[in-house]
Amino acid sequence: MQTTMMDVGLSLNGLLERAGRTFATQQIVSRLPDKSLRTHTYAQWHRRTRALASVLQRLGLQPGDVVATLCWNHHVHLEAYFGIPAAGGVMHTLNLRLPPGEIGAIAADAGDRFLIVDDILWPLAQQVMAQHRFERVIVFPFSGAPVPDGADDYESLLAGADPDGFSFVPHDEHAPVSMCHTSGTTGSAKGVVYSHRSTVLHALVGCMGDHWGLKNTDVLLPVAPMFHANAWGTPYGAVMCGTKLVFPGPHLHADDLLDLMQIEPPTLALGVPTIWLTMIQAYERALTEQPGRWTMPQGLRSLVGGAAVPESLIRAFDRHGVWLQQGWGMTETSPLATVSYPRVELQDAGADERYRRAAMAGVTVPLVDLRLCDDDGADVPHDGRSMGEIQVRGPFITGAYHGVGSPADKFTPDGWLRTGDVATLDDLGFLRITDRSKDLIKSGGEWISSVDLENALMSHPAVAEAAVIAIPDERWSERPLACLVLKPGAGFEPEAMREHLMAAGFAKWQCPDRYEIIDAIPRNSTGKFWKLKLRERFTR
């Protein structure tokens, strides 16, 4: 017997067309640099997106060509999410928080042809362009300022386009649609390329009730950057469901977000723990200093990821009627792989158990296979105590890296992705992250390479050896601590060291906040730095 089902490929183009037709009056709200709000309907967004695709084709974009974005969260970035693939291109989101040299290297690795950039990021773009040459640079006049000489005006290009005459580029469901870079165990950026198929499947899984639970009646506030694993895939889910979107633009300070919530109350928001920590601090401070300034949107759910969520933070928000829902994933997993949500087996559990479970990474989502393996590659028991490396596979899990392939340290012989994260699983399937086997530091949802920092520190004439470890931080989840062995007779000034690191290409936020001068760095039996001993010494 054979199936009678049609063989119709999955495509973002279908989501775009359906949204413009079915949800024509739904709103997309963007906060501009001056903090005013600009609103488009889905019908207007649909037409502008088709116009962008038409423009890109007219400029010579060929199937598979890469178009970079250097943008905050706003309607034009959403147009790029769908317009670039509609033209047959691959959208490559550039992380504007990285040093310019690193952004340029990432753009070169991807082979970016065109760049779409916010006008307020033009100074950064100029530094990036010194590292990588884009054939065309298209500036979105986000602030309304004149577009710089030598660049194309995004709005002028769209005004002269023919969205009605545009035709989608034929494609296979496995054709690439977007690309993000992630840091691997060596600290070097690696490209992950998503397909029409993987993106649609990820959005469908994400929209399930126990996960994002997106509905047409929801209002989504994506605080997580659209250059971070595509804002966790939620823009695709929002378009799929016709959800109202409220984009915060560049205004991510706690006060700004709380102000925005008074104007456009969300029912669902997402961001890294640092965002929610600073928000609850500002909110509770205002309760006594400025009573009545803000109210928390009742029933708001906040998706939190990118770093572990403290149970105390979940409790703090719950006191004000907001529930924090934790998930786990990575750029390589699109990123949603697990979500913590209420289970029927726990409906009679007390509050303490409910909070304890909420602080876990959660349960594996459908279509993702997850296993924990010990150092010998054997499965570990699901007893909530035995630890192993998380390994995953599935239709929206990457099987390789762009230009690198499938290195043995990242993929098992039987094709599973080795995440480098260490965890336990219990009998209900709840995942609890216990450690990371890699030495990367995750600060405010951003990766910092300890290896790169160590190399730069040891290039200073006063430093003989340097080892960098992550230490817990209430606000940023983790911050780098540098342990230094100085050369005989050498002095040390923290400010001078920070200037040295920034001159080497590090951003200010990537530099260590704390330095410890020690006599020697402990080593293991193979001569490698024994960072466990440093963590035991300095993180008590």
Residue ranges and their predicted role:
Residues 98, 104, 115-119, 394, ...:
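AMP-binding/adenylate-forming catalytic core of the ANL superfamily
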Residues 28-74, 78-82, 99-104, 155-156:
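Conserved AMP-binding/adenylate-forming core of the ANL superfamily
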Residues 15, 58-59, 86-159, 488-490:
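Structural core segment of the AMP-binding/adenylate-forming
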Residues 39-43, 177-204, 530:
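Conserved AMP-binding A3 loop
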Residues 9, 24-26, 159-181, 188, ...:
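Conserved pre-ATP/AMP-binding loop-to-beta segment of ANL
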Residues 200-219, 229-268, 282-290:
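Conserved AMP-binding/adenylation subdomain of ANL enzymes
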Residues 363-391, 427-428, 490-494, 530:
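Conserved beta-loop-beta connector loops within the AMP-binding
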Residues 240, 266-271, 280-355, 369, ...:
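Gly/Ser/Thr-rich phosphate-binding loop
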